[in-house]
Amino acid sequence: MHELSVALSLIDALTESLGTHPDVRIEVIHLKIGPLSGVIEPALRSAFEIAAVGTIAEGAILAIQVPPIVLRCEECGQETNLSGADVMDNRDGLGSWISWLPPACPACGAAALTVVGGRELELVAAEVRRG
């Protein structure tokens, strides 16, 4: 379960940035997690809850934004956005998204699509309370 490693790394990064002052608490952590990042949101939430115990992030809320998958045609340059929810709802039984992605560019028909967005795993911001 690599979500635990992600949660621990997130807490380490925030603790390093904010220090370990007893009067500092993280209330909300804003993340951007692409549907192709390999991170399963419910597993990350559970792992984070466990990893945060006894840290400045204990009790913090994870506010997660899911950006679209962006495909670019190498022939015509057309970019196509696919919502992460659509892809996640259409995965096959093995959790694969590849079989659902369009095989060709909707604009020119070329089978030359490259994924240029949707793999994000970013710490965007943290809302902190002092005192």
From Swiss-Prot:
Gene Ontology MF terms in the entry: nickel cation binding; zinc ion binding
Gene3D superfamilies: 3.30.2320.80
Residues holding Ni(2+): 2
GO biological process: protein maturation; protein modification process
Statement: the UniProt record of this protein carries the keyword Metal-binding: yes
UniProt cross-references to PROSITE patterns, sorted A to Z: HYPA (PS01249)
Name recorded for this polypeptide: Hydrogenase maturation factor HypA
Binding locations of Zn(2+): 73, 76, 105, 108
Coiled coil: none
Function statement: Involved in the maturation of [NiFe] hydrogenases. Required for nickel insertion into the metal center of the hydrogenase.
Keywords noted in UniProt: Metal-binding, Nickel, Zinc
Alphabetized InterPro entries for the sequence: Hydgase_Ni_incorp_HypA/HybF_CS, HypA/HybF
Organism: Thermomicrobium roseum (strain ATCC 27502 / DSM 5159 / P-2)
Family under the similarity heading: Belongs to the HypA/HybF family.
